[in-house]
Regions:
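Acidic glycine-/aspartate-rich tracts in secreted/extracellular proteins
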Residues: 53-56, 79-81, 372, 406-410, ...
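Right-handed parallel beta-helix/beta-solenoid
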Residues: 12, 20-37, 52-54, 78-79, ...
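Glycine- and acidic/polar-rich repeat regions and solenoidal domains
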Residues: 58-66, 78, 83-94, 108-123, ...
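Bacterial N-terminal signal peptides
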Residues: 7-16
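N-terminal extracellular ligand-recognition/capping segment immediately after the signal peptide
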Residues: 30-39, 44-73, 80-90, 111
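Positively charged n-region of N-terminal signal peptides that target proteins for export
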Residues: 1-4
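Surface beta-loop-beta hairpin patches that serve as ligand-binding interfaces in beta-rich domains
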Residues: 363, 400-452
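Short catalytic/signature loops enriched in Gly
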Residues: 386-408
Length: 452
């Protein structure tokens, strides 16, 4: 391990007096003690850089100071991924520490990291997180936290990579999680190894307004839920899940949107609760169900219930589901889906394309089913070859019967999975036949600390 004991002239000059916004400066440090001293004196606009190397922390590196919206405090590695924090502890935000950017560190320490209630508008970016302790690695409790361009990988123990919580009787608001790489969670237990968990059961009725987008998940095998949403009013969009046991799951809560995700290999989408929109997703899997209407153990969940709430008024529209053993499936339970819609989806596979339990209240319209038994009322689909062509993903060809075949009004599906705007009569499925703009599944080059 490399040790540092020198403090540069810049830091010696810095600590002689308090920093102000007008005197914002870059301060380079070469030890953890100097880093802590610089953080303790930091003011709006200051940037503190820790030199490349490996450092062992015997106690938490406390962040108590705040920047401003226009002049955040930045605490960063000199070069992304080149300053490693080992030992028994890492960075610790104090309640009230706000407008702070934590950037570029390689975190290999014990314990965990959290942004507490009362700490707002903080950003954790370009971190390489592979902690040595158990439990949940990173917890975000503060409003308006941004967690982006990080990598979290390689664990075999129970506990989630990232969870978003908040106060005991509310959720953290407007948390944004984007362009991260989650990989290789191999916990073999039955529960408790999610990559992302957005709330707990008792948060289900609280509105979070969170966004989870442009993240890549590979070998997310720690739980059947890679992204587990247990709060209300969230958006999960434009993510790629590849070769993973974990699904996108709306486990609790209402009024969330799952849009434009690309799910490859073993993953899919499952939902419980009310008034969700599941639109413009692409599911290509040979080993699992594509989209699942979750089981209902109760008609509507109470605020602290851990049972499965039946789906009510959920719209599943303009998705493409290909190559699945069971395309769209209803789990059953005592309480069946009620007032739900399955519209304008392309379903292609060799197994039963739709399999819903008796007593389900679902409106079917405009779907295209090909290759296996449709499993829908005859008026709810057309049994025609959608004439998909593959360029890495299956898309419409110019002669597809899906072109301009959408029925009904679903304006919230107006952006296809290529992020192109639909107009006129929409094309059935996740892809609108338009020139240019073909989107690819995310790769490691698109996410994580070294991505653009």
């Amino acid at each position: 391990m490399r040790h540092f004991c020198l403090v540069t002239a810049a830091i010696l000059a810095f600590v002689t007096g308090p920093a102000t916004a007008s005197a914002a400066q870059v301060v380079r440090v070469t030890s953890l003690s100097a880093l802590q001293a610089a953080i303790d004196k930091a003011g709006p606009g200051d940037e503190i850089r820790l030199a490349d190397g490996s450092y062992s922390a015997g106690s938490a590196i406390a962040i108590k100071r705040s920047g401003t919206a226009n002049a955040p405090i930045t605490i960063t590695a000199e070069h992304v991924g080149k300053a490693e924090i080992k030992g028994s502890a890492g960075f610790s935000f104090s309640s009230g520490a706000s407008h702070v950017v934590l950037r570029g560190f390689k975190l290999r320490h014990g314990g965990s990291m959290s942004v507490p209630v009362g700490s707002t508008h903080n950003r954790l970016t370009r971190l390489d997180v592979q902690l040595t302790g158990g439990g949940n690695w990173v917890t975000l409790n503060g409003d308006d936290t941004e967690f982006d361009h990080n990598v979290m990988q390689n664990r075999t123990t129970q506990g989630v990579f990232l969870q978003v919580l908040g106060p005991a009787k509310d959720m953290a608001k407007r948390v944004k999680v984007h362009h991260n790489y989650f990989s290789n969670h191999k916990f073999t237990g039955s529960n408790g190894g999610e990559s992302i968990r957005f709330g707990l059961s008792h948060h289900q009725k609280y509105s979070a307004g969170g966004v989870v987008e442009y993240n890549l998940f590979e070998k997310a095998d720690g739980d059947s839920e890679a992204i587990s949403v247990k709060s209300s009013d969230n958006v999960v969009r434009y993510n790629t899940i590849r070769d993973s046991r974990g699904f996108i799951v709306l486990r609790h809560g209402d009024r969330s949107v799952v849009e434009g995700n690309i799910l490859l290999g073993r993953s899919g989408i499952r939902f419980h609760g009310n008034d969700h929109k599941i639109v413009n997703n692409y599911v290509h899997t040979t080993a699992n169900r594509g989209i699942v209407f979750g089981s209902g153990n109760e008609a509507d969940s109470g605020p602290d219930s851990k049972l499965h709430d039946r789906p009510d008024r959920v719209v599943v529209a303009y998705n493409t589901v290909v190559g699945t053993t069971d395309g769209i499936h209803g789990d059953g339970g005592d309480f069946k889906p009620k007032d739900c819609v399955l519209a304008n989806n392309i379903l292609q596979g060799t197994g039963k394309l739709v399999s819903m339990p008796g007593g389900s209240d679902v409106k079917y319209e405009g779907n295209i089913a090909w290759g296996g038994p449709a499993g829908m009322p005859s008026g709810g689909y057309k049994a025609v070859d959608p004439k998909l062509v593959q360029d890495g993903l299956y898309r419409l060809s110019s002669g597809s019967p899906a072109v301009d075949a959408g029925v009904g009004s679903y304006p919230y599906a107006g952006t296809d999975f290529d992020l192109q705007t639909r107009s006129g009569k929409y094309d059935v499925g996740a892809d609108e036949l338009l020139p240019g703009g073909a989107r690819k599944a995310l790769t490691k080059a698109d996410v994580g600390p070294l991505a653009p």
